[in-house]
């Protein structure tokens, strides 16, 4: 009987040892799995943040480019509108060309062209 007890005791120790080893192995595997998942999650988060930041920066650059183009276009339209309004006022005789102050520095070609137009208007009587 002692032989059986001793045999079963040894077997029990073996099973307990195996269970402990299995439990330890499962725990280690779970820890490694957790580490792996956390690593992948952290890297994914970094990449997502980097991608979002990159997209936001590109969007900001594009918005700046568009706003610069819009401002430039608005300035051009405003300048042309003022020029045309001045031309209409001069042509209709409401104001004289000399009474208008220059809205922007003119280039040489534009200044001589306007002088010719004023001279022609004076000859034709403003019609």
Swiss-Prot record:
GO cellular component terms, A-Z: axon terminus; centrosome; cytoplasm; cytosol; extracellular exosome; Golgi apparatus; neuronal cell body; perinuclear region of cytoplasm
Location relative to the cell: Cytoplasm, Perinuclear region; Cytoplasm, Cytoskeleton, Microtubule organizing center, Centrosome; Cytoplasm, Cytoskeleton, Spindle
Major subcellular location class: cytoplasm
Region (Disordered): 96-127
SUPFAM superfamilies listed in its UniProt record: Synuclein (SSF118375)
Region annotation (4 X 11 AA tandem repeats of [EGSA]-K-T-K-[EQ]-[GQ]-V-X(4)) ranges: 20-67
Spans of repeat Sequence: 20-30, 31-41, 42-56, 57-67
Residues bearing PTM Phosphoserine: 67, 72, 124
Source organism, top-level taxon: Eukaryota
Modification after translation (UniProt): Phosphorylated. Phosphorylation by GRK5 appears to occur on residues distinct from the residue phosphorylated by other kinases.
Keyword annotations from UniProtKB, A to Z: Cytoplasm, Cytoskeleton, Phosphoprotein, Repeat
GO MF entries: cuprous ion binding
Record text on subunit structure and interactions: May be a centrosome-associated protein. Interacts with MYOC; affects its secretion and its aggregation.
Function: Plays a role in neurofilament network integrity. May be involved in modulating axonal architecture during development and in the adult. In vitro, increases the susceptibility of neurofilament-H to calcium-dependent proteases. May also function in modulating the keratin network in skin. Activates the MAPK and Elk-1 signal transduction pathway.
Entry protein name: Gamma-synuclein
Biological source species: Homo sapiens (Human)
Name of the gene: SNCG
